[in-house]
Regions:
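Phosphate- and other anionic-substrate recognition elements at nucleic-acid/protein interfaces
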Residues: 1-190
Length: 190
């Protein structure tokens, strides 16, 4: 079984597929526990007043908040993956997550300014998802969200429409772009 993830701030669509690209499981998972900001750098530490709930926080306070959020994301992701493993009929061998730059900054003062503050929280989710998969012994694949569906279609050839769009007819809604992206990521990883 291969798992593909299309994540957002605080939640993700997860699709599990068999070796011949049949959808075995699809679900929405929560990636953060309640009561914490889903995008701490963008919404709490960023430069935009409209996103901040209160006065700006300094770097040490933001770093502490990011650490707390990251720990929460790790717990929630681990619990969601435990539920997924229990639900699928065969072992999971790989996890595909959206790609992120290997050289993405880690310094909180750098992360809170453009161009990094708008991407920092997303990178955190990608990193935590990958860490949780690695901890389970899954092979980790990264995909380009803008290209993965086209890459999967090229791999599938004449089967592309049936495989990528067919699950909506077979499984019913929801079957959104996120579902197709996650499924396509499992195909490209195969």
């Amino acid at each position: 079984m291969r798992v593909g993830v299309a994540h957002h701030f605080g939640w993700a669509v997860v699709v599990t597929a068999s070796a011949d690209h049949e959808v075995v499981d699809r679900r929405r998972i929560e990636l953060i526990e309640p009561g914490l900001p889903a995008a701490p750098i963008h919404h709490v530490g960023g430069p935009h007043e409209m996103h901040r709930p209160d006065e700006p926080v300094d770097d040490p306070a933001l770093a502490a908040l990011v650490k707390e959020v990251r720990t929460s994301v790790a717990r929630a992701t681990s619990a969601a993956f435990d539920e997924l493993v229990a639900a699928v009929p065969e072992p999971i061998v790989s996890l595909s997550v959206r790609s992120w730059p290997d050289d993405f900054p880690v310094d909180i003062a750098v992360l809170r300014v453009a161009p990094y503050e708008s991407r920092a929280d997303s990178v955190m989710y990608c990193e935590v998802l990958a860490e949780a998969g690695r901890a389970r012994g899954w092979e980790i694949h990264r995909y380009d969200a803008k290209r993965v569906e086209a890459e999967a279609a090229r791999i599938l050839g004449t089967r592309a429409d049936d495989v990528l769009f067919g699950p909506r007819a077979v499984l019913g809604p929801p079957w959104s772009k996120d579902h197709r992206t996650a499924l396509a990521a499992t195909i490209v990883a195969a």
